[in-house]
Amino acid sequence: MSNPACSNLFNNGCDHNSFNYSTSLSYIYNSHGSYYYSNTTNPNYINHTHTTSTSPNSPPLREALPLLSLSPIRHQEQQDQHYFMDTHQISSSNFLDDPLVTVDLHLGLPNYGVGESIRSNIAPDATTDEQDQDHDRGVEVTVESHLDDDDDHHGDLHRGHHYWIPTPSQILIGPTQFTCPLCFKTFNRYNNMQMHMWGHGSQYRKGPESLRGTQPTGMLRLPCFCCAPGCKNNIDHPRAKPLKDFRTLQTHYKRKHGSKPFACRMCGKAFAVKGDWRTHEKNCGKLWYCSCGSDFKHKRSLKDHVKAFGNGHVPCGIDSFGGDHEDYYDAASDIEQ
């Protein structure tokens, strides 16, 4: 029969070792080939460290180290990278789903070229009444404003001055067409139309006041550039200079760029301006002589010669090809009438 005291002691010890002995075992392998067993218990218990020495002939088994790709740091970086890629894709898809937005970028300095024009239906110098009348007649005028002060090759135009570049039809026909309300004949000048109206009856005669037209005088006084390319009076020419006014431009355009319907019946020379043709036929075939023996085809050339040499040089007379010269001139006068 056992001793009750010993039995109680044994049972208490077993219970203590069975239920209250909670351990946490960790294995640590050092470089000397020893395993350390660390038993972590409550503060009331004992930690046991057991050192096992292995013989050199039988090295201990070594566990394979985990791959670096499975390390927590690398795994976290991969997760962050995947999250960034997913976020970028979502933002890109949202941008594509949004309606397109157009942005105008104005890069560079503003270009204030000479070719920039201010299109208007009237001249800036015209009065209000003239502007209304020009608009009613449908006059289309291109008014250019010179903006570059540093350009020396554009004549005497400066900032704030205006000029006009008429079209070929405006040059040849005229900027304004006045129409007779009875026969619908057109005239370039208001005075000519009024005189034509007098022929329809005395009821259209209203005295001298009826001849005072309302032409766009402000527009006709503007300096004009020629519209023909390559002309020295074209605005794109390196040394372009504007012509004084519209009438001067008309004569220039007819002489330099227009057709020449008038031909001299003495020599066959063609002219674009009727006045030039009349003057030429009047003097064609004539020779002007100087007292020094020089002859000239033009009277103005003889005058320049006498003025240049002075004493001893005086006009002597005029010679012509034949007596039929006056007949040619008379015939030309009859045609003009």
UniProtKB/Swiss-Prot annotation:
One of its GO terms (molecular function) is DNA-binding transcription factor activity. Its main location: nucleus. A motif (Nuclear localization signal) lies at residues 254-257, 297-300. A zinc finger (C2H2-type) spans 178-200, 225-257, 262-284, 288-313. It comes from the Eukaryota. The keyword DNA-binding does not apply. Pfam families: C2CH-3rd_BIRD-IDD, zf-C2H2, zf-C2H2_STOP2_3rd. It is found in: Nucleus. GO terms for biological process: primary root development; regulation of DNA-templated transcription. Keywords: Metal-binding, Nucleus, Repeat, Transcription, Transcription regulation, Zinc, Zinc-finger. GO terms for cellular component: nucleus. Belongs to the WIP C2H2-type zinc-finger protein family. Probable transcriptional regulator. PANTHER family: ZINC FINGER PROTEIN WIP2, ZINC FINGER PROTEIN WIP5. This is Zinc finger protein WIP5. It comes from Arabidopsis thaliana.
